[in-house]
């Protein structure tokens, strides 16, 4: 796991904070911006077309959606609907991509210069309902409903996610409240205080249970607004000093080859920065009783974000120092690591989906992880397919070993057989 470089897939004209991949179209969606400050740095959501060209995965800018003075800090995807966390609000976007016959001129006076962003040329920003057409692919993005989701003195929505059937979305922010909203009307259906202080992350399970982690060092499991249990990762964890830890991220994941199986994965980081930083930890939990199954150290770099692959096979991690790693979910062993890939905090990571266009784009690799950071770059991390020995070859080797053993015994002891 030495030093290596990850290929740069795309560079945006603004800091990137959030990332999603649409499995049906293969669109990579990256969002961010410079915020409301008048620094000249724009805010937007970029839709990138992924293509496999000569065995290499590439990304080209297909559409740039202007978010005016609001930088998108977090994203969730449900079919053709995006939920974007922008300051204290959640903005729903709908995007539609389909093939067109022939190339048509771009509508709405677009100044887009083609699907690939040319060096030195700023991408055009698209207003509500704008369309872009390139090489037969049309993309239309429109703003839907928006609602304020956080009401603290310094309000900020920090996380958003959809439920399993995409009919509800949950938000959390700096005021410590979880709020659940209908999709797409954004009518509020539930509100409750989950943490004292900021909510760092939340995850909705297929059975409706909600897991929240906060800066108050707690991780809680909820059924609607009723507390089911609190997580205690140290019950099955390592023995260490009295250094306080807090939960940084949580994600549900499937159990490979077990359709009914469910796992919860959490990341624990030191609550305070120390001169000699203690390690961070990954924990796998039983998704039904929320007991810890396995805990492993994931290094001394503070983890900033977590993602789980679609099949639940792999975990992707980003750190505040810019490193990116891929772990296998079963044993929590590290399979891939790039130190300081970005050189600055990794703000989000996302796996290439394993359905839809995913297998076509993956090529001969086992999985692909995308990472974005404040350095405005989107990087690609590929895990080569692990070589395995065919069963027939193992059987042949066993038979050969038996024959050689018999011949050796026969030569050493002529009357043995």
Swiss-Prot record:
Topology of this chain in the membrane: Single-pass membrane protein
Stretches of the chain found on the membrane's Lumenal side: 410-417
Highest taxon above the source species: Eukaryota
Chief subcellular location: endoplasmic reticulum
Any Gene Ontology biological process: regulation of COPII vesicle coating
Subunit field text: Interacts with SAR1B (GDP-bound form). Interacts with MIA2; recruits PREB to endoplasmic reticulum exit sites. Interacts with CIDEB; facilitating loading of SCAP-SREBP into COPII vesicles.
Descriptive protein name: Guanine nucleotide-exchange factor SEC12
């Amino acid at each position: 796991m030495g030093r290596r470089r990850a290929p740069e897939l795309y560079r945006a004209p603004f800091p990137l904070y959030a990332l999603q991949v649409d499995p049906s179209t293969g669109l990579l969606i990256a969002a961010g911006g410079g915020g409301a400050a008048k620094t000249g740095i724009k805010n937007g959501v970029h839709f990138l077309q992924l293509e496999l060209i000569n065995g290499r995965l590439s990304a080209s800018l297909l559409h740039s959606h202007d978010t005016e003075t609001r930088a998108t800090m977090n994203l969730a995807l449900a079919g053709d609907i995006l939920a974007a966390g922008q300051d204290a609000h959640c903005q729903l976007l709908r995007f539609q991509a389909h093939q067109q016959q022939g190339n048509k001129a771009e509508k709405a006076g677009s100044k887009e210069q083609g699907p690939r962003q040319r060096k030195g040329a700023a991408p055009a920003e698209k207003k509500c309902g704008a369309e872009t057409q390139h090489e037969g692919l049309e993309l239309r993005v429109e703003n839907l409903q928006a609602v304020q989701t956080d009401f603290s003195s310094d309000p900020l929505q920090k996380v958003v996610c959809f439920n399993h059937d995409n009919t509800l979305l949950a938000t959390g922010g700096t005021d410590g409240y979880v709020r659940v909203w209908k999709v797409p009307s954004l009518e509020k259906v539930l509100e409750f205080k989950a943490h004292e202080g900021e909510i760092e992350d939340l995850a909705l399970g297929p059975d409706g249970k909600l897991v929240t982690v906060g800066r108050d060092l707690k991780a809680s499991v909820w059924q609607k607004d009723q507390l089911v249990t609190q997580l205690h990762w140290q019950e099955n964890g390592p023995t260490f000093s009295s250094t306080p830890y807090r939960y940084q991220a949580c994600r549900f994941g499937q159990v490979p080859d077990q359709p009914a199986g469910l796992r919860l994965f959490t990341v624990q980081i030191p609550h305070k920065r120390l001169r000699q930083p203690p390690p961070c930890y990954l924990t796998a939990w039983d998704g039904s009783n929320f007991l810890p199954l396995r805990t492993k150290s994931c290094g001394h770099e503070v983890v900033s974000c977590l993602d789980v692959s679609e099949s639940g096979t792999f975990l992707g991690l980003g750190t505040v120092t810019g490193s990116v790693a891929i772990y296998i979910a079963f044993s929590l062993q590290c399979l891939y690591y790039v130190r300081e890939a970005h050189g600055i905090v990794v703000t989000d990571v996302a796996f290439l989906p394993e359905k839809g266009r995913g297998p076509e784009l993956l090529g001969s690799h086992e999985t692909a992880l995308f990472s974005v950071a404040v350095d405005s770059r989107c990087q690609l991390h590929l895990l080569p397919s692990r070589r395995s020995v065919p069963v027939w070859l193992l059987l042949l080797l066993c038979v050969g070993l038996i024959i050689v053993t018999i011949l050796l015994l026969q030569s050493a002891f002529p009357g043995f057989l």
